[in-house]
Swiss-Prot record:
ATP binds at G44, P45, S46, G47, C48, G49, K50, S51. It is found in: Cell inner membrane. It comes from Yersinia pestis. It is a peripheral membrane protein. InterPro entries: AAA+_ATPase (IPR003593), ABC_transporter-like_ATP-bd (IPR003439), ABC_transporter-like_CS (IPR017871), P-loop_NTPase (IPR027417), PstB-like (IPR005670). This is Phosphate import ATP-binding protein PstB 2. Part of the ABC transporter complex PstSACB involved in phosphate import. Responsible for energy coupling to the transport system. The keyword Cell membrane applies. It catalyses: phosphate(out) + ATP + H2O = ADP + 2 phosphate(in) + H(+). GO terms for biological process: phosphate ion transmembrane transport. The lineage of its organism: Bacteria, Pseudomonadati, Pseudomonadota, Gammaproteobacteria, Enterobacterales. The complex is composed of two ATP-binding proteins (PstB), two transmembrane proteins (PstC and PstA) and a solute-binding protein (PstS). It comes from the Bacteria. Belongs to the ABC transporter superfamily. Phosphate importer (TC 3.A.1.7) family.
Length: 258
């Protein structure tokens, strides 16, 4: 299904994307545009393909040889699905934060510095500045500035997830992918992450997968509803939640199934 938006404002353009887990056809003819410096949410019931779609944007599936994508995904006009794509550089441009907080088994400081060192050779002073910048962007600096050399595991769950966001933006990507980033967090921590998502779009293109429709409504500018591997509806968030065009969308957001 084709649901393109304004191409001139697109960071990612998906065209006729099909995805397979072995012989299982998980994504079916997906076409949509992800707008620059906006938050796009993917919603739908479990197994609908929303996380699969998200993970095609940085080719996470390449870790598993039985998985494959067909079609086109253009990032700034370049098709990332070609074999010529440098995976390391792609994942530097397209950062990802997972469902459960995944701090590295190292200090808070080194959690941030680790990825930066893979792509840049910074002086200690410049690295200190980058670490502070990333933690500040992730609304974590004031809580960690006096314990940067303590383990990342010493932080609370909500703090660990913000640490993962700081780690993701420290390498200065263009796009930030968030796969159910609040599902393991308490309501207060969730609120802080949602505030952070709204702030991050001034610098990044953000794509979030969420089971929480209220979260999608609060955080996103555009929302895609998926069902059984198909893109059912894609529009600006207010329109999708107030005047959905497809009965399947209306049934889902009103709780008739899901």
């Amino acid at each position: 299904m084709s649901m393109a938006t304004d191409v001139t404002n697109s960071k990612i353009q998906v065209r006729d994307l099909n995805f397979y887990y072995g012989k299982f056809h998980a994504l079916k003819n997906i076409s949509l545009d992800i707008a620059k410096n906006q938050v796009t949410a993917f919603i739908g019931p479990s197994g609908c393909g929303k996380s699969t779609l998200l993970r095609t944007f940085n080719k996470m599936y390449q870790l598993y040889p039985e998985q494959r994508a067909e079609g086109d995904i253009l990032l700034d006009g370049q098709n990332i699905l070609t074999d010529k794509q440098d995976i390391a550089l792609l994942r530097a441009k397209v950062g990802m934060v997972f469902q459960k907080p995944t701090p590295f088994p190292m200090s808070i400081y080194d959690n941030i510095a680790f990825g930066v060192k893979l792509f840049e050779s910074l002086s200690r002073a410049d690295m200190d500045e980058r670490v502070q910048w990333a933690l500040t962007k992730a609304a974590l600096w004031n809580e960690t500035k006096d314990k940067l050399h303590q383990s990342g595991y010493s932080l609370s769950g909500g703090q660990q997830q913000r640490l993962c966001i700081a780690r993701g933006i420290a390498i200065r990507p263009d796009v930030l992918l968030l796969d159910e980033p609040c599902s393991a967090l308490d309501p207060i921590s969730t609120g802080r992450i949602e505030e952070l998502i709204s702030e991050l779009k001034s610098d990044y293109t953000v794509v979030i997968v969420t089971h929480n429709m209220q979260q999608a409504a609060r955080c996103s500018d555009h929302t895609a509803f998926m069902y059984l591997g198909e893109l059912i509806e894609f529009s600006d968030t207010d329109t999708l939640f107030t005047t959905p065009q497809q009965k399947q969308t209306e049934d889902y957001i009103t709780g008739r199934y899901g």
